[in-house]
């Protein structure tokens, strides 16, 4: 697989160089062949920023503010494909190869990135690895009572990738992105610093609203008939949880034992809701409800932002708007 990756990348780079030799005026912005001669004006002055997922993309936009026109921002996962099943296209690799700043999560789902970075054309490119930024705050994946075990054994430690679902983490990560942008574009560093500070205040305010909702809630446990990517969020506010699968699970069918256990926990805790994440398939949650004594629990959905699309962005979706919607759902779940 790795040989195929390198062969593809080499072919793409060669094609770009040949195109540049034939007609330098037609080289696309961001191409690795667009370096100017000593007497030629630079092909572009925009900062090229590539992000993998929506939260990173939206944070970059917020930090740039009214300077967004000075940058070319790409969100690789913009068509609804889940983070855990994404595979980069040839065009994605070219964009990453020549960008000035690359922001990615850095978990198991980003296993393709290492080879891409080694082959990148822009050796001066800055890279922000979210898990590295957070350091010891990153949590190991955990299997709680009743959670279905993975069929595939993992010898190495696995870390929970879903760090963006903590508002506290978001504030730290925004600071790291702001610092990188200030280095890339020192003429506008004061603007980026001020924008990051203002956005951080919004994150802190929403964080306080979450804490207030949890403190006022009747229940302190969430139960997901689904994967569970909200570990960082529940840990921030001292909530407990049960779930069918871990956050990065590839499983989609819950066993009879898993469903029975979760239904029993709903009854024991008198929980009013069974939770799911975004997506159309809520079959496991529905089956759990049907196996409870009352069979009348509501099914509520929280958005983990793993499938946010370019169309969602065009429609005005932001990180803060989705986290605010998640707060509304959380309030209902906690009673």
Q: Language-model segments: which ranges?
A:
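Positively charged n-region of N-terminal signal peptides that target proteins for export
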Residues: 1-8
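Extracytoplasmic metal-acquisition and chelation regions
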Residues: 21-335
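Bacterial Sec-type N-terminal signal peptides, specifically the leucine/valine-rich hydrophobic h-region
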Residues: 14-18
């Amino acid at each position: 697989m790795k040989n195929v990756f390198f062969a593809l990348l080499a072919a793409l780079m060669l094609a770009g160089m040949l195109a540049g030799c034939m007609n330098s005026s037609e080289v696309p912005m961001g191409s690795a062949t667009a370096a100017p001669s000593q007497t030629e004006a630079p092909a572009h002055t925009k900062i090229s920023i590539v992000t993998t997922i929506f939260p990173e993309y939206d944070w970059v936009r917020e930090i740039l503010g009214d300077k967004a026109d000075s940058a070319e921002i790409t969100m690789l996962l913009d068509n609804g494909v889940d983070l855990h099943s994404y595979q980069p296209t040839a065009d994605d690799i070219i964009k990453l190869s020549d960008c000035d700043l690359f922001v990615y999560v850095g978990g198991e789902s980003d296993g393709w990135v290492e080879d891409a970075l080694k082959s990148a054309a822009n050796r001066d490119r800055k890279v922000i690895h979210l898990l590295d930024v957070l350091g010891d705050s990153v949590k190991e994946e955990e299997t709680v009572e009743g959670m279905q075990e993975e069929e595939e054994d993992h010898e190495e430690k696995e870390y929970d990738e879903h760090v963006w679902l903590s508002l506290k983490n978001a504030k730290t990560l925004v600071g790291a992105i702001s610092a990188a942008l200030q280095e890339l574009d020192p003429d506008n560093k004061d603007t980026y610093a001020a924008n990051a500070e203002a956005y951080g205040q919004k994150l802190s305010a929403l964080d306080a609203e979450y804490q207030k909702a949890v403190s006022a809630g009747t229940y302190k446990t969430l139960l997901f008939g689904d994967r569970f990517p909200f570990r960082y969020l529940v840990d921030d506010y001292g909530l407990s949880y049960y779930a069918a699968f871990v956050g990065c699970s590839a499983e989609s069918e819950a066993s009879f034992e898993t469903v029975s256990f979760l239904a029993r926990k709903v009854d024991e805790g008198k929980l009013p809701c069974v939770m799911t994440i975004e997506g159309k398939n809520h079959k496991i949650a529905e089956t759990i409800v049907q196996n409870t004594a009352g069979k009348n629990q509501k099914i509520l959905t929280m958005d983990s932002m793993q499938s946010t699309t370019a169309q969602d962005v065009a429609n005005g979706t932001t990180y803060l708007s989705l986290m605010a919607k998640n707060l509304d759902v959380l309030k209902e779940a906690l009673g």
